[in-house]
């Protein structure tokens, strides 16, 4: 059993206590008695002590503790777990399901509860250390996911549905969910090894147990038999004699699942009665229903090979079965439901009855490993179906073994009677982290659960901490709308009531396969009171449970299918029942729980500002989505990325209008990837908004696919506005063209999405949200596209762009900082505009499109939204389209979210009709964020435009074309900020002329914008010069940067990138479709963009535009390459070298926090880290290596840390011993194979292939992904064209030589001074006016005359010590010199050359002015006519040198003055003869 989570705080009512005989068997989770799990809970004893009074442990700590199934107290071999005990554990795990504590080995079925408590206490000290270690190991394993996948498949066995089978029936309830055992044995073996280490302790514990058991009336203290006749409570002490062999790992091949029979012969023969002692009880239990020896469709099964001991045990188990009354097995299978604490007092007896039989059944050996929260993503199936029910209380209910058959039968009946009462109201089964994200763990619960009527292992309300355990005045038990399947069932239940049908009939008539859960939110409906559904009678309750299970199963299959189709589990938006849901793009689903109906919601609202990661589960909606989003816990620390999801409560102002009827109507079936929005647009209640904060991928790639995908996911978003135009693709949002026509052409995929979306939209309409929305909803950029229902723009707010799932109003509320009034105005204007300009509004489909139109008011909003930065972060995802996500959060988040959000979109490239449009969402996000950085208002508008543009990105180019017009209106509204030239990028640049297409324009824009203002750069992430973030695709970025980027970019880094991308698409400059030209984009989106920008302009770092410009210029031309016409995500800004790791890392240096010791080799570094940094930690363990991705993340496992630090010390410690082969390997074995290959190759004379054979075999995965990985390592994923060949080498050498002519090495320049004039000073001495050469670097000056009157002065100046202006001149001189032919005297003093040539001691000086003017341009000629000029020693050559030098000067001068109009090839003027120059001492210049 993977570790159970025992929540001591959850209030363990020991139901077991109710019946004394069973009480010991049922260990309340906290009870220390559970030594086998080694996680002894200190307050456990109290539960045990009072048999009849269920005690709620006051332990406030909610931390789940992991309990492992195997008994650590075993004295036997390290790996051996007595099969009996294993079975028992399995049984309890499966049987009690979540509610049951593991009553495995440690649990003795003792007659008196008190005795067991005593025993537990006595064992506690002995097992405590071991338990601690085991706990550490378990946690480590779970955290490192080493445990492997515990995959439970929830398959109902045919018979299920009865609360408790008749005593006569031996078969276990068929519909118990069977769960597969873990696939990885490595982890299990590891655990067994740990156990062996603790062997001695175990032996001691065992003795203690036996002693304790002796005190109890146990017929066989050491009975290995799993279940003795129930009559005699057997203390099943772990019997050392039954070692369980380490599990064999069964590899799963997708094509042919291994037959269980082959792998586990013992399974083949397992009696279907479930009492089999085989260690793989889980499979046996599953087989029980079908009576076949095979376990149903398990792909991963870890089965222990049968050993003689096990066979013996099995036989014994069979024998025991003979004696055992049939009831027991069924009882075992039943899951025990621990009654809510309040109820428990009234009906103590029934609870035990649920699990009357002691231990006979072998439930699944491995219970679903509940991990620490947030380690892993819940498998979508579970998320949807299981409603993330809390497992924390899993161990709570104890297995109650009935002393007599009668007791068992009675108990079963009692259980049936009380089932309704026990129903956990709205318990949330928070299966939060299952060991693996990829595999769904079934609620292990379940084998016994169904009969008990608790299919999900739901915990009692009491345990869950729900106050609603007691029936209401009418004797009905409220079922908090169970999220997910639960809500669906509710719906069915209500329908059934209305139609007077039985629930099952209803279910049958309406298959839940569609996942179309519609939550009936109508409060007027039958049975709904206070938004709670009350189950009227036990029959209905049973039906409810059955249907719930059915729904789960259907969902599971469906989800499995869906999962493959859908993208990696993106964060699913969890839509609350009442929430206006927008379908969210898979990537980050915004959790829109606007609904506070459910208890979960209420919780969520309480934690409104928590990150949703945990809250997600709270949110009812979560269950609904098949895909569970992984939400990371928010880490606010600066080091952490912004929380993925921020939950905020929605302001009441949010249009709560969606009328429940509208909500009720069933939406078109959502595509698997689109979450149907279950939530009706019931925004009215202040719902919680969870917005994923993750920014979109760094640079939203314009990849059509991604956009398409996003679009698909968002597809549900109906066009929010009434506009007829179909929702434009996500991306379309940016392009101005996107406007009304916008989505039409691209609409293809969008349309599909649209189908469902329109419903949402209708909902919104119906709910009157629209009018309302327009006011409350700001065109917050945040509104996520997918949530079509909400947006002021129609539902633009609703778009559930991943970030903003809820309606705009929600968004607004989410950003509480935003001033409401302004937002309202803005939203009104926005919504109005959107109505009027459905185009943009409609666009919402695409992220970018989402951006609300920007109206002047909106702009105001933007300013207000400055406040929003936090919100923005959350938005940023959703906004990605909305430029509003300027927030740096986007950028920083972008990195984090980058992957999450980008991938999702990318899959749907084809889907995005816009084609390019898809990528835009991310881009828009980024741009938005950068934009946001931009200065608020103007910037906003510009940014908006740019972001629109950028988001439009490639899409824009297409989309832009038609819709630009609508953009204009937006632009007008935006006027306030910038004249946003209608469609043209104007908005972004604000410069009136944006000739985006004209480079000239761009240039002017560039300057214009540069001066325009310091833009806030959202963050470095925003990308190159911030522009990057805007245009996701490097291509668009490059184009934008090159052509318009300046125009847009400078205005805002984000803007620039956005506009650049937009401009690209528009502009011819980038021939690639890449981004729509900013004009178009900005034009159309600009209003929207600006609106969104207004929505969130978080404060950002201010960066001088000049910098941005420079960066954009520096973007390599190669970025504009054909390969980029397919947008690629740019992962890192190009020159980000240091990237937080402090620049280049050196081998042997320890970068541990506060430790920078240098070691000769990596092996010494590893030793150092082990001794000084790992061994010195006492726990929790954390890696403090600066720059480590898990820096300071605590782990409970030292061994994890030991393994982890290897990655910092160079994990490949084994170097090939063959000379000339520098390969290193991470293991001795790999090295050995490699070295052998060297020699085998030579022996076999396969010299030709030796190279190949000497390399370690390339893993298949690497071969498959090698190319991808290779590109990933580059700063740009796209190919970089650097043609580095001999020509380049020569050029570099030339430059080095030219530099040497100037600097003479040593980073210093030696200046030769020529005396130009003399004067007599007051003291009677002479001073010379020295002109320094190389000239034009340092200023001339008067110096005392040289003693020898040579008038030769020298001065050596270090470049680093020069003034900035001087350095600039040196730079321009060199840049000019690099274009000249090499001449050793290039920078030689003209006078010196002249003297050498002419031989005049006085050093005749060439007439600088004359020569300079005449020869200014010579050099260029020289460049082109190099043949003409030979560097001979002749005087002409020297003259030429002088002229070339002067040309250098003149060119540099021209450059510095930015005058570049001199003719390309001015006529060559022969320099005047130097002999005519006569030196003189006169003050006049010679």
From Swiss-Prot:
Instruction: Indicate yes or no for the key word rRNA-binding.
Output: no
User: From start to end residue, where is composition biased (Basic and acidic residues)?
Assistant: 852-868, 1244-1254
Biological process terms in GO annotation:
axon guidance; border follicle cell migration; central nervous system development; chromatin organization; glial cell migration; imaginal disc-derived wing vein specification; leg disc proximal/distal pattern formation; negative regulation of transcription by RNA polymerase II
- Tissue specificity field: Expressed in the imaginal disks of the leg and wing.
Compositionally biased spans, kind Acidic residues: 1405-1430
One example GO MF annotation: protein-containing complex binding
Principal subcellular localization: nucleus
Q: Does the keyword Repeat apply?
A: yes
GO cellular component assignments? ESC/E(Z) complex; nucleus
Tell me the InterPro entries matching this sequence: AEBP2/jing_C2H2-ZnF, Znf_C2H2_sf, Znf_C2H2_type
Please state which protein family the record places this protein in: Belongs to the AEBP2/jing C2H2-type zinc-finger family.
Q: What is this protein called?
A: Zinc finger protein jing
Provide the species name.
Drosophila melanogaster
Q: Which gene encodes it?
A: jing
